[in-house]
Regions:
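Conserved active-site-proximal phosphate/metal-binding subdomains
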Residues: 1-147
Length: 147
């Protein structure tokens, strides 16, 4: 069971408020599956950047070859990276750049990974205490705790 998104959208999370809102407000129709830069299937919220990328993905992957490989940031953040290695079976984007944008709360440029399951409190941003109460007991608090 993966519950990272549940904790990322709590009040106590140090994530940018836009980061929390993008994850909390995404409905099932907003979440897409695509090929990550690591070559693994990934789910994320369909943001403006991801929509643009997916429109170009097929062509980018078709043109990817080791002789055209490049890492513009030179950060070597991944051992295997479709962009850095020129591997067309993987995504052709800089994951470090897109995740950094998401961390800053940049909804237009960020990549916001998110599971497909609904969140325990829907679109509400609740406390860690409420989340743990729900996860451990199955009891969903009806009214939010005071901030």
């Amino acid at each position: 069971v993966q519950v990272g998104t549940h904790f990322a959208v709590t009040r106590e999370s140090d994530a940018h408020i836009n980061f929390k809102r993008v994850l909390a407000e995404a409905g099932p129709e907003d979440i897409v599956t695509f090929m990550s830069a690591e070559g693994l299937p990934a789910r994320a919220v369909l943001t403006p950047w991801l929509k643009r990328y997916l429109g170009r993905e097929e062509g980018l992957r078709a043109r990817a070859t080791p002789d055209k490989a490049h890492c513009g940031r030179q950060v070597e953040c991944l051992t295997f990276c479709g962009l850095k290695d020129g591997n067309g079976s993987a995504g052709q984007f800089c994951i470090e750049t897109q995740l950094a944008a998401a961390q800053r709360g940049d909804v237009n440029l960020g990549l916001f990974f998110r599971g497909s399951e609904s969140l325990p409190f829907g679109r509400e941003i609740r406390s860690v205490h409420e989340l743990l109460t729900y996860l451990l007991s199955g009891i969903r608090p009806t009214t939010p705790e005071p901030a």
